[in-house]
UniProtKB/Swiss-Prot annotation:
Protein name according to UniProt: Major facilitator superfamily domain-containing protein 10
Family: Belongs to the major facilitator superfamily.
Domain of life: Eukaryota
Cellular compartment(s): Nucleus inner membrane; Cell membrane
Statement: the UniProt record of this protein carries the keyword Cell membrane: yes
GO cellular component, one term: nuclear inner membrane
Residue ranges crossing the lipid bilayer per the database entry: 27-47, 86-106, 113-135, 148-168, 176-196, 202-222, 275-295, 310-327, 336-356, 359-379, 421-441
MF annotations from Gene Ontology: organic anion transmembrane transporter activity; tetracycline transmembrane transporter activity
Native source species: Homo sapiens (Human)
Length: 455
């Protein structure tokens, strides 16, 4: 199979017709699931992994500890080493997402010109390399290096949404985005449980196995979904617009889309920008609390890695159930209303998690949290996928994913800092109230007719 051809593992002439939509969705689902299984193995292990580097007196980790302790003393705070790992986790998560933020729009713009398949394969090679670096070394520096390489290469997620956005019918796009949500749910169900059951030294090797399998699977079975006649004229045009793709203000204004060929009309562009702001605010708030959740349960309830894995398993199982029974059945045009309901549920969800001192209260909060997490991103992605001409789909979805990466870059660091400074209750209470901001923005959304049709 050549880099730009259709399915199968042997060379053949390029395919000029659109591949079957069901096949594309299935390949995207399975490939993304393998990627997420590798990624989520780490989630229940992170608190213990960071603490193990501290106990091993790793020189780089020790220098981080010393710097944070010095800063705490300088501002008159008591030195609380047990909260330092929360801050470090936020820093690592933010660094990973900063690199996603920088690379995702460039990945999308490049795929608009070269096609989805070759760029996807390059991203997956980088992801596999990141796990190989982690697997072959036990130092904190090597772990950080693997996270940085992974962040640079993580454009495969935005490419998955761009591939679904290439599909011809609004119903196929809507169902495809829901299936991507199912892949996330299953990945966050099975991956953490598997990671928690593995010895710490085996986890990176299993992640590498999943990543290598994903690369081989996509190489053999992913067809090209962007025909030559619908591609952008040149990569140079995309790189020339790098400022639009990397500037936070330009991203929020979708400037790369507005200045491209065949941009959306004025009303639709205004709606697209508001949807982008909602997406950014939601993920900024959600990712911050999501990243601190495992540290809260580790410190308040003394959850072990196995218990963390069980928690993420139940979260993922709930999300997968909601995705299959509810989210994928939302009809085109009903996504915004579903998102508003989910945002309102997050207010009591995070209040219960932040203040709960018993496992039943925590469980109720996690149930509401899981419902919202299963709905918001797939529904917003489905709506946004209806904007832009066929040659702009990669740029539209790459810009959206860059907004998400920017939110995930800032969210964990800000939430972890508030957690470190003021504690879990103050952090979760403040963030739960802030979820009303994206809700009110959607209340005022001008939702043009025919949104789900391709431009």
């Amino acid at each position: 199979m050549g880099w730009g051809g259709g399915g199968g593992c042997t060379p053949r002439p390029p395919i000029h017709q659109q591949p079957p939509e069901r096949r594309v969705v299935t390949v995207v689902f399975l490939g993304l699931l393998l990627d997420l299984l590798a990624f989520t193995l780490l989630l229940p292990l992170l608190p213990g992994l960071l603490e193990s580097h501290g106990r091993a007196h790793d020189p780089l980790y020790g220098s981080w500890q010393g710097g944070v302790d010095w800063f705490a003393t300088a501002i008159g705070m008591p030195v609380e080493k047990r909260y330092n790992s929360v801050l470090f986790g936020g820093l690592i998560g933010s660094a990973f997402s900063v690199l996603q933020f920088l690379c995702a729009p460039l990945t999308g713009a490049t795929s608009d010109c070269l096609g989805r398949r070759p760029v996807m394969l390059l991203c997956l090679m980088g992801v596999a390399t990141s796990y190989a670096v982690w697997a072959t070394s036990r130092s904190f520096a090597a772990f950080l290096a693997s996270r940085l390489i992974g962040g640079i290469s993580k454009g495969n997620v935005s490419l998955s949404t761009a591939i679904v956005a290439d599909l011809g019918s609004p119903l196929a796009r809507s169902q495809g985005m829901a299936v991507i949500g199912v892949a996330f749910s299953l990945g966050f169900t099975l991956g953490p449980m598997l990671g928690a059951s593995l010895p710490l030294e085996m986890a990176p090797w299993f992640a590498l196995l999943f990543a290598a399998s994903d690369l081989l699977f996509i190489f053999c079975f992913l067809p090209e979904t962007l025909p030559l006649e619908k591609r952008a004229p040149s990569i140079a045009l995309g790189f020339r617009d790098a400022a639009d793709l990397l500037s936070p203000l330009a991203l929020l204004r979708f400037s790369a889309v507005a200045r491209g060929q065949d941009p959306p009309s004025g009303d639709r562009l205004s709606s697209l920008r508001r949807l982008g702001l909602v997406y950014f605010l939601y993920l900024f708030l959600f990712s911050g609390l999501e990243y601190t959740l495992s540290f809260l349960t580790h410190q308040r309830f003394q959850f072990s890695s196995l218990q963390q894995g069980k928690m993420f398993f139940l979260i993922g199982l709930t999300m997968a159930t909601i995705q299959g029974a509810y989210a994928r059945r939302i009809h085109p045009g009903g996504e915004v209303a579903a998102v508003k309901r989910a945002l309102l549920l997050l207010v009591p969800a995070f209040l219960l998690i932040g203040w709960g001192r018993s496992l039943p209260v925590l469980g109720l909060g996690l149930l509401l949290y899981s419902f919202a997490a299963a709905v918001v991103v797939p529904c917003l992605s489905s709506v946004v996928a209806g904007y832009g001409s066929p040659g702009q789909k990669g740029t539209v979805m790459g810009t959206l994913r860059s907004l998400g990466a920017l939110a995930r870059a800032a969210g964990p660091l800000v939430a972890a800092s508030v957690y470190w400074l003021a504690g879990a209750q103050a952090c979760f209470t403040t963030w739960s109230g802030l979820f009303l901001l994206p809700f009110f923005l959607l209340q005022k959304l001008s939702y043009p007719a025919q949104t789900l049709k391709a431009e």
